[in-house]
Amino acid sequence: MANALASATCERCKGGFAPAEKIVNSNGELYHEQCFVCAQCFQQFPEGLFYEFEGRKYCEHDFQMLFAPCCHQCGEFIIGRVIKAMNNSWHPECFRCDLCQEVLADIGFVKNAGRHLCRPCHNREKARGLGKYICQKCHAIIDEQPLIFKNDPYHPDHFNCANCGKELTADARELKGELYCLPCHDKMGVPICGACRRPIEGRVVNAMGKQWHVEHFVCAKCEKPFLGHRHYERKGLAYCETHYNQLFGDVCFHCNRVIEGDVVSALNKAWCVNCFACSTCNTKLTLKNKFVEFDMKPVCKKCYEKFPLELKKRLKKLAETLGRK
């Protein structure tokens, strides 16, 4: 061994080694301690850690600066496994679906409008563009009529009737968390909607002596569902508050709401008691107070007296003209 070291030379400086000198052995290559340094910065390796590239050794910092790619997502250097995709480099944990953030490194991805998406998200985006549903079981596009179960779309043939076991179609019905073919469902005494005449599987609205799907109990004028809000009945039809009063009731000129209770009729308009006030100072008025009309709104006597003389003359003349008609 002594003879071998006597003839050995440093891999870097090609010099020999003193008998008691500390020698660094790296994969069979021998170095003086001061010669075992980074090929770029010529500093010793922190804690002996180095990276080798094309026969040269580098400290971690210089190896990253010279050779390690930067992650397109986080901007950090990538040491270890590199994902090459979309003309960029990524850490495996940084390469994620642009929509759901699922890690794509081991499951693959699909390019979609410049985005990298997992296959389920790609299918959903494709279906949205085609105006179609995505099956929530197999994640494929549903080309035919979907079966809606617990508010999610499915291929009907993924399910069987809970009663007779028959493979289901899009006409299947949900009842208490179970799916039934239409014949079995209709035998169970399910309420029928007064609008569409089809069975009601979920919430039932009881109104006007009938039962309705929530979305089918609507205003006869605007056809918007009431969704639990108050409705008004007239000759067998239901109306929302706004259209009932537009058609049959009084709407306050000031707040544009239905007048509940007493109505103040003034200036050829209807007002809520609390809304009938001076349009200048907001003092509450009654029909017993003196007021004048200005810009189709009431003005109290005190505010009227503050008007310019010329304006008061014109208002008085206008009132006299209207009074003669």
UniProtKB/Swiss-Prot annotation:
User: Oligomeric state and partners?
Assistant: Component of the heterotrimeric IPP (ILK-PINCH-PARVIN) complex composed of ILK, LIMS1/PINCH and PARVA; the complex binds to F-actin via the C-terminal tail of LIMS1 and the N-terminal region of PARVA, promoting F-actin filament bundling. Formation of the IPP complex is dependent on protein kinase C and precedes integrin-mediated cell adhesion and spreading. Competes with LIMS2 for interaction with ILK. Interacts (via LIM zinc-binding 5) with TGFB1I1. Interacts with SH3/SH2 adapter NCK2, thereby linking the complex to cell surface receptors.
**Name of the gene:** LIMS1
Cysteines joined through disulfide linkages: none
Give the principal location in a single coarse category. Answer: other
> Per its record, what are the GO molecular function terms?
actin binding; protein kinase binding; zinc ion binding
So what does this one do?
A: Within the IPP (ILK-PINCH-PARVIN) complex, binds to F-actin, promoting F-actin bundling, a process required to generate force for actin cytoskeleton reorganization and subsequent dynamic cell adhesion events such as cell spreading and migration.
What region holds the LIM zinc-binding domain? 10-62, 71-121, 135-184, 193-243, 252-303
Q: Which residues carry this modification: N-acetylalanine?
A: 2
Q: What PROSITE patterns does this protein's entry cite?
A: LIM_DOMAIN_1, LIM_DOMAIN_2
* Entry-linked InterPro entries: LIMS1/2-like_LIM1, PINCH-1-4-like, PINCH-1/2-like, Znf_LIM
Q: What is this protein called?
A: LIM and senescent cell antigen-like-containing domain protein 1
Tissue specificity is: Expressed in most tissues except in the brain.
How this chain sits in the membrane, per its record, is: Peripheral membrane protein
List where in the cell it is found.
Answer: Cell junction, Focal adhesion; Cell membrane
Record bears the keyword Repeat: yes
A single cellular component GO annotation? focal adhesion
Do you know which Gene3D superfamilies this protein is assigned to?
Cysteine Rich Protein (2.10.110.10)
Q: Which GO terms describe its biological process?
A: cell-cell adhesion; cell-cell junction organization; cellular response to transforming growth factor beta stimulus; establishment of protein localization; negative regulation of DNA-templated transcription; positive regulation of canonical NF-kappaB signal transduction; positive regulation of cell-substrate adhesion; positive regulation of focal adhesion assembly
Which keywords does the record carry?
Answer: Acetylation, Actin-binding, Cell junction, Cell membrane, LIM domain, Membrane, Metal-binding, Repeat, Zinc
